[in-house]
């Protein structure tokens, strides 16, 4: 990476906020009926003989993942939830897998199945948090969700906290569950790494959309921090590479005790990174405070509704 960028955010724009403000969390039901039905019968590892749309990694699997993501994002967006920025970027990346998959990946079956396994970890963490089952929520996600609910970090912070929890914490376990080989037996690492190129193709437009929807100062903060879309893409790519290595460590563990030790190290790494992100993207450092941000989002939604 040309520069880490993240550590320079603290010196970007010293805008004093008015203190944290609680954000009323939206109610998102625990998965749409079609999603829950599919997940119940989806095998852990993709197989060419599965009759489940994600079990065999068919293109319909990505459609199902995107549909559930969209259903959830629409609820978050309509309430100006601070969880919406992460959900939006995640949705745009997953849409890219479906749109660009045919030309970008050698074998989409594995990635389609992995995307379903991966997404369900986020859905489950969010649903447990909203239901008050906080002990079932990984610590990195607890930090992200609490920061969003209390309105203590910037839009960039909400994005990075979500991406860290999902990539640094969830992805190793999703990879270990799905396996590191395609249904035909070949290593899936090549296509896994090609996702990094997809990230590069959607990051700039996605960050611009985040600014339009949630905080027009996002671009200014990124420029002042010398954190450009390519840096965000490279940061996420680095986390993804670490996650593949962590999945290999999980699968190489010979005993439950060894696996538990690897799992603890994954959790600790994601949690430590979350605390760093939370500190350097505090809206007391980068602004604006939650009240200003919420007012902007609500005005935009009212204008959008009036036009329609």
Regions found by a protein language model. Give the residues of each.
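Acidic, low-complexity proline/glycine-rich segments
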Residues: 25-68
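A cross-kingdom marker for long, charged
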Residues: 25-42, 225-308
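Extended amphipathic alpha-helical scaffold segments
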Residues: 64, 68-110
């Amino acid at each position: 990476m040309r520069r880490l960028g993240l550590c320079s955010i603290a010196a970007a724009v010293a805008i004093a906020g008015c203190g944290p403000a609680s954000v009323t969390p939206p109610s998102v039901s625990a998965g749409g009926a079609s999603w829950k039905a599919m997940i119940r019968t989806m095998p852990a590892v993709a197989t060419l003989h599965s009759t489940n749309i994600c079990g065999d990694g068919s293109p319909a699997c990505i459609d199902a993942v995107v549909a559930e993501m969209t259903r959830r994002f629409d609820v978050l967006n309509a309430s100006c939830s601070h969880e919406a920025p992460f959900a939006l970027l995640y949705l745009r990346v997953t849409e890219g897998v479906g749109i660009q998959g045919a030309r970008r990946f050698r074998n989409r079956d594995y990635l389609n199945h992995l995307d379903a396994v991966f997404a369900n970890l986020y859905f489950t963490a969010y649903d447990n948090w909203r239901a008050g089952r906080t002990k079932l929520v990984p610590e990195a996600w607890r930090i992200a969700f609490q920061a969003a609910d209390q309105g203590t970090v910037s839009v960039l912070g909400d994005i990075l906290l979500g991406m860290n929890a999902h990539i640094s914490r969830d992805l190793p376990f999703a990879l270990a569950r799905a396996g590191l080989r395609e249904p035909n037996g070949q290593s899936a690492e090549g296509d896994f790494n090609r996702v990094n190129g997809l990230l590069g193709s959607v990051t700039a437009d996605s960050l611009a959309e985040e600014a339009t929807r949630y905080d027009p100062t996002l671009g200014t903060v990124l420029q002042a921090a010398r954190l450009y879309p390519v840096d965000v893409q490279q940061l996420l790519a680095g986390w993804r590479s670490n996650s593949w290595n962590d999945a290999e460590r999980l699968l190489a563990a010979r005993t439950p005790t060894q696996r538990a030790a690897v799992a603890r190290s994954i959790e600790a790494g994601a949690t430590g990174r979350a605390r760093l992100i939370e500190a350097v993207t505090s809206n007391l450092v980068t602004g604006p405070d939650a009240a200003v941000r919420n007012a902007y989002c609500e005005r935009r939604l009212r204008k959008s509704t009036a036009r329609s």
